[in-house]
From Swiss-Prot:
Protein name: Acyl-[acyl-carrier-protein]--UDP-N-acetylglucosamine O-acyltransferase
This protein's UniProt keywords: Acyltransferase, Cytoplasm, Lipid A biosynthesis, Lipid biosynthesis, Lipid metabolism, Repeat, Transferase
Gene Ontology molecular functions: acyl-[acyl-carrier-protein]-UDP-N-acetylglucosamine O-acyltransferase activity
Catalytic activity: a (3R)-hydroxyacyl-[ACP] + UDP-N-acetyl-alpha-D-glucosamine = a UDP-3-O-[(3R)-3-hydroxyacyl]-N-acetyl-alpha-D-glucosamine + holo-[ACP]
Family: Belongs to the transferase hexapeptide repeat family. LpxA subfamily.
GO cellular component entries: cytoplasm; membrane
Summary of the function given for this chain in its UniProt record: Involved in the biosynthesis of lipid A, a phosphorylated glycolipid that anchors the lipopolysaccharide to the outer membrane of the cell.
Native source species: Aliivibrio fischeri (strain ATCC 700601 / ES114) (Vibrio fischeri)
Biological process terms in GO annotation: lipid A biosynthetic process
Subunit structure: Homotrimer.
Pathway the protein contributes to: Glycolipid biosynthesis; lipid IV(A) biosynthesis; lipid IV(A) from (3R)-3-hydroxytetradecanoyl-[acyl-carrier-protein] and UDP-N-acetyl-alpha-D-glucosamine: step 1/6
Domain of life of the source: Bacteria
Amino acid sequence: MIHETAKIHPSAVIEGNVTIEANVSVGPFTYISGNVTIGEGTEVMSHVVIKGDTTIGKDNRIFAFAIIGEESQDKKYGGEATTVVIGDRNVIRESVQIHRGTVQDRGVTTVGSDNLLCVNVHIAHDCVVGDNIIMGNNATLAGHVTVEDFAIVSALSPVHQFCTVGAHSFIGGASVVVQDVPPFVMAQGNHCKPFGINIEGLKRRGFEKAEIHAIRRAYKALYRNGNTLEEAKVEINKEIEAFPVLQGFLDLFEKSTRGIIR
């Protein structure tokens, strides 16, 4: 179903069970096929490929040569019906690739809302990308990666499969992430190492001074005081009641399968 207010270029090809909502525009030579829904006000520019099952929310901007909903690059993938779900107000720049999930995991690749995905970003199968994230040019996520809200993954930085990039963290350019990055932490290098707290980012997002100081103490407990991970957990846990923002550290420690960058 194509809404009467949608603007579809004559050279675009649309086939299958496609729903295009009000005020969507589809540019020349774009190909949309399968069980695809494109939400109100989304702009799909020229030469884009969108395949199903894929659901895209409202007011997104999708630039030329982006490919969304293609099969995963997992050798175990056998054509199963898996999905991509994308939220609202994302900017998806040229040649970004977002692949469908696999039945070996969640079966869905998800991207939240208000993200900036720069040129040539790759988001592999079963990734979970939150809200308000920036991924620089040629940043890549292998399968099963989680990137939490407000994280920044700078240009040319790959993230190993099953890793988590914590909320409000900052990955420097051309870094290689092979273990989990705790929330609020700045990290860089090959392999990626911690080098402080993303204080400027926290100030911009309205964190209180007391919260930032508590986050710095948690960072010192984890990296500067010679503690084991278990000892750091104990120190951080002492401040959870006064500073619930620290819960993100403990949540990551609990679910980590790759280990924490050290």
